[in-house]
Amino acid sequence: MKKIKIYADGADINEMVKMDNENFVTGFTTNPTLMSRLGITDYLGFAKEVLSKIKNKSISFEVFSDDIDDMYRQALILRDLGDNVWVKIPVTNTKSEPTYDLIHKLSTEGVKVNATALFTHEHIEKVFDALNPNINSIISIFAGRIANVGLDPEPTMKFAAELTKEHPLVETLWASTREIFNIVEAARTN
């Protein structure tokens, strides 16, 4: 069984620094919505400040553009901020345009991608096909939101876990966690 890793999700730098001191926290994720809620308007400045304080754990920063070409440009800027940066790319934009080609391009260029907002087996399969198997990557499956609509997220997470056996550099992230029990469920999916 793989070891469970805990990622703290947020945009409050002081809280992130506190969590950085906790042994159980493996890394961090944030996104434009969380930052907007805290009134953060200088995304690049925020990212640089976080990275100046958190140096030894992975941090996933999400692109904020809805245009796929601009997502690519932003991803390269984020990638260049540090070796511990993963670039979050949503599996589709708000126009429901898939980003699999973008994920493939970035991954092929050596960008550590955190493909996010995955809900379905199709999303998972297409992202796995897009990722460079020689580059560390994360797929963030919104298991909590799957559960919110009354579905059991475990089969979806188990499906992804099976695929990681063939892609050992790809990790699955049980995203949108709602309950402590989700840790038990995640452990059961291996």
Task: Please report, for each region that a protein language model flagged, where it lies by residue.
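Catalytic alpha/beta core domains of metabolic enzymes, predominantly
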Residues: 97, 101, 111-190
